[in-house]
Amino acid sequence: MLLRRLEMLNFRNFARQAVEPGLYFNVLSGRNAQGKTNILESIYLACTGRSFRTAREKELIKREKEFSSIRCLFETRGREVEVKVTLVPGRKRIEVNGVLKSGHPFGWPGVVLFTPDDLVMIKGSPAERRRFLDYDLGPFHPHYAHCLDRYNRVLSQRNALLREAKEKRTTGGPLEVWDEQLCRYGSRLLFLRVSLLKKFFPAIRALHRELTEGAENIEISYLSSLKIGEECGEDEIYERFSGELRLVRDEEIARMQTLVGPHRDDLHIKVDGHDARVYCSQGQQRTIVLTLKVFLIEQWRSETGEYPILLLDDVLFELDDNRREALMCRLGGLVQTFLTCTRVNFDIEGFKAKVFTVSGGEVT
């Protein structure tokens, strides 16, 4: 997928701005707080229907203005597609070729984003790593999103009953009905997670070897609160889940929360046998996340027949020279990339790069 033209009106610190990007590397250079990330945000919003920085439309509107709009002209699957997003406080309107659209403009992400905040996947809590499973790998299975939604709904209802059981000092009898549903959707969800990880890990490992020039080996394993093996089938997971719920029932009522299940699981990421969260340098952690982003790009290419757009916010220039060049050589001529930096401090000749200067809400 290619972005041919971007127009912003009253978006963040931009009054009125049009940008015609290049086909490959687009470098947005400028001092901090000039609007570089705002450009990436506008592209992400047009591709996905949401911002990666805020859920409040008001924050996307230029100060003292009543609305903002973004218009993007994309080339996708051999045709031109116009996406227009209009924002007023508390409301968002998305049009695709003049037709109102709810949710995702394209039906698939169309964009892969890497910001410094993504390092929390390595350094942060298990919830951050589950997000990778649920929202990055999950879309590659047709039933994953439905299963995740049903599990979360049942989990929320069950936790409410646990709170009620403690307050009323009951044994939580009605929980049995919800236990069955929790085990049904939870066992399916856990099975899908493990299956997707097993399916995709060889490609992830090979990519990581390539980006580190064979110097490092990555391992990713699934850590289940049910303590199951990776070869367990769905029925076996269900039985283990059901048994664990019975064992911890009293403790769950006391703590008013469900203590076992895929919502408590984690990924264990190691490099050369060492826990990446504890022992890897920030550069190594950044390379792990970059590996996962490149994997997503190539997997979406396999699924849809075209590459998504890549957005890199102040991360490319934090890589060492060898890893940066390995990445650019891999993506060059294939993926339309937008990257931000405070200054261009490496040789971009030969990478078909188009350089823009961003200053005070203007692009030149």
Curated annotation (Swiss-Prot):
Highest taxon of the source?
Answer: Bacteria
Recorded GO MF terms: ATP binding; ATP hydrolysis activity; single-stranded DNA binding
| Keywords, in A-Z order | ATP-binding, Cytoplasm, DNA damage, DNA repair, DNA replication, DNA-binding, Nucleotide-binding, SOS response
Q: Does the keyword DNA damage apply?
A: yes
Q: Which Pfam families match?
A: AAA_23
Q: Which GO terms describe its biological process?
A: DNA replication; DNA synthesis involved in DNA repair; double-strand break repair; SOS response
Reported function:
The RecF protein is involved in DNA metabolism; it is required for DNA replication and normal SOS inducibility. RecF binds preferentially to single-stranded, linear DNA. It also seems to bind ATP.
UniProt name for this protein: DNA replication and repair protein RecF
Q: Which organism is it from?
A: Pelotomaculum thermopropionicum (strain DSM 13744 / JCM 10971 / SI)
Gene from which this protein is expressed: recF
